[in-house]
């Protein structure tokens, strides 16, 4: 196993990065609505929200907030992209053990993500599964937008060859 990847295990239980603030404006919310074919007025109709929503303004889709996690991870943890790079290594999204949408993100709200390494497990040679604690903060709010336990796989050398063989590449 590549030494940098093995040494990452020493960070279990520690904060490992925070992304910069990111603006969630109406244009981004509208693009997400279009991409997901979801015209819910709670997200895309400011007039409807002013009259009928308890928030009195549009809010971001919870799935929009969730979908930003990959971007936030690259912003906060860019140094991770080099783990295993000398062996052709790369990371894969492995899903979630837990995810909660705690507080809605208001239109024109700014959010950022905080990451903690919770677990590091060598599944087999060339495959390391990491569990990250993630909290998405909303600027000026006490409750987070999202809390999650996010799983990722780091693939190097032998793991890559196994995946390549399995998928007939």
Residue ranges: model-predicted function:
Residues 1-11, 101-169:
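HotDog/MaoC-like acyl-thioester-processing domains
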Residues 1-92, 159-169:
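Hot-dog-fold acyl-thioester-processing enzymes
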Residues 94-98:
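A beta-strand/beta-hairpin structural motif
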């Amino acid at each position: 196993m590549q030494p940098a990847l093995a040494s990452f295990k020493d960070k279990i239980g520690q904060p490992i990065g925070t992304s910069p603030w990111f603006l969630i404006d109406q244009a981004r919310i509208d693009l997400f609505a279009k991409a997901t074919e979801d015209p819910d007025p709670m997200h895309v109709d400011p007039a409807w929200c002013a009259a009928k929503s308890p928030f009195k303004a549009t809010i971001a889709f919870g799935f929009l907030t969730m979908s930003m996690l990959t971007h936030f991870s690259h912003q906060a943890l860019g140094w991770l992209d080099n783990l295993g790079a000398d062996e052709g290594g790369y990371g894969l999204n492995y899903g979630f053990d837990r995810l909660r949408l705690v507080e809605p993100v208001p239109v024109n709200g700014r959010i950022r993500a905080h990451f903690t390494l919770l677990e590091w497990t060598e599944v087999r040679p060339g495959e390391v599964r990491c569990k990250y604690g993630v909290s998405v903060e909303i600027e000026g709010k006490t409750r987070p937008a999202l809390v999650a336990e996010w799983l990722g796989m780091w693939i190097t050398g032998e793991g890559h060859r196994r995946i390549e063989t399995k998928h007939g590449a």
